[in-house]
């Protein structure tokens, strides 16, 4: 079964159970959007529908919009589906899964891009797929800046963003050597507070910006 999410622009909220939301709000359709109906409805969505949706969402983004890249695995019992056949499930090794990739706006939390990939798709292929499709649909330099979690931190992904000309903010694992070297320069006072970092009153966080040199090699050498 599938679940449909509805995003309300006016209220700036999202609801993960549409059938419950229908109890208190008027919707474009009087039909009850239960899980079975949503499953049948989602099966009618074609690749052309998906591409048209992404194209329309990109046009609605303001210049310099901020988007976040994320993914999740979805388990399934289908044995003939290509996306599920090669999926590696982290919770149950005997249950295959697909990889659901999406980009959403950090301002409105509305979806901008989504795609289902095979469960064994690595992060480098994921990022390249996202950038390639969004570029084909009209994404230009500086149209959208990307934020990723530490799972996407690699030189290959940095090179993909750099080649696209897209600004990006990439989280990194604290165990990586460049991160360890930066953290080792932080000094603390007798109370355990950092003395060579800035403090942001709004977020109540300490921060410090450092330059880390890295090399990006073009595909043509």
Residue spans for each PLM region:
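Anion-binding and metal-coordination hotspots
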Residues: 1-221
